[in-house]
């Protein structure tokens, strides 16, 4: 997903996939803090913010223990407020259902504690979010079904796309729309 986003000009954070046996020297040059998370979990399971190299190995072990596939994503930390975007696509046409402001515990685990929907965004920012997410859905060739996109918006209004799941959001986001 991240490779597709980068190739298509969608704004993902820099990230590296760590599989069992990967030489961790591939992470040299990444800027701290880092986010370490399993590739295949939801609900913030196994996510850790790492401030320094000495804590990296333990975070990778923790994420791998939470992963079904035993694969871990290490990404550069993205500043900004976190949002999720719920969409439904039918025959390649995307429909924005809601943008949700997310509240979390913050570092180091980022466990969600609450939501506000609709998110208090200007019409201009809402359109910018819609445009970024729809382009990313096209990048992933999503034609039919629900999607749950996660992104961050910094103070300058820049959007970084974290990920897209082919499902509705959890924590009652979909049912409370």
Predicted regions and their residues:
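Phosphate-binding core of ATP-grasp and ATP-grasp-like enzymes
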Residues: 63-71, 76-120, 127-161, 165-173
């Amino acid at each position: 997903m991240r490779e597709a986003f980068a190739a298509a000009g969608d704004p993902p954070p820099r990230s590296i996939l760590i599989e069992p046996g990967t030489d961790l020297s591939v992470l040299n040059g990444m800027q701290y803090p880092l986010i370490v998370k399993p590739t295949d979990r939801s609900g913030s399971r196994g996510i850790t913010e790492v401030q320094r190299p000495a804590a990296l190995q333990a975070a990778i072990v923790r994420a791998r223990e939470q992963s079904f596939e035993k694969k871990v994503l290490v990404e550069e930390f993205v500043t900004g407020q976190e949002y999720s975007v719920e969409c439904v696509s039918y025959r390649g046409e995307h429909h924005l259902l809601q943008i949700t402001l997310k509240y979390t515990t913050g570092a180091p685990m980022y466990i969600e504690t609450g939501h506000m929907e609709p998110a208090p965004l200007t019409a201009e920012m809402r359109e910018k979010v819609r445009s970024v997410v729809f382009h990313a859905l096209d990048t992933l060739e999503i034609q039919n079904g629900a999607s749950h996109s996660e992104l961050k918006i910094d103070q300058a209004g820049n959007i970084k796309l974290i990920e897209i799941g082919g499902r509705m959001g959890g924590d009652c986001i979909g049912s409370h729309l």
